Amino acid sequence: PYEADALINQLCHYGVDREYAIARRSHEYLLQHPTWPTEWILQALSIAWYDYLYTGDSRSLESSYELLKPRILMALREKNGLISTTTGLQTDDFLRSIRFKGQIRDIVDWPHTGILGLGKKQGGEDDGFAFTDYNVVTNAWHYAALKQMEGIAGALGKQDDVAFYASESDAFKKRFIRSFFDVRKGYFTDGLAADTDHASLHG
């Protein structure tokens, strides 16, 4: 399984069934056997949080709490405060902390141009996204993970962690907007202004 598929299936499953164990089982399996996309590692927080919101059962949060923390990917933050998978921060210790063998990399959307039967110039689902060292999509998921970890910590009564993640998410939101929002054009760009002015807009 893949985290992104598990997240979609989880929310669909909640809409048609009264028993939510399948989604939780997939989530707990993926915590031990994660897949390669950066954003999907971050989506572990979404899956965990939605499991709690829909069931009110905090047991999975409790047992997975220490596994969830490194999946916020704070270890990949550079000096500018943004996360990146391409600037040399994927150490052996980091990869062990997320239970992954190999290097993770940003996906944005799938499939990319020219693969899985698409012609070399035939567009995929990433809408010509301009990949840089600091990608807006990846950093948006990082912000979401911080907010969700704040909620998870609150559900478990870990007030010191609540305060920490609340502070981190507030500061990161400001940094994110300052880094990626083009005030003149009125939209978020794919990466930092120094790297690209391209924006993959979805209408």
Predicted regions and their residues:
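Substrate-binding groove/exosite segments of carbohydrate-active enzymes
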Residues: P1-D93, G123, N135
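The feature captures the catalytic groove of carbohydrate-active enzymes
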Residues: H27, Q32-A44, R77-D170, K174-G203
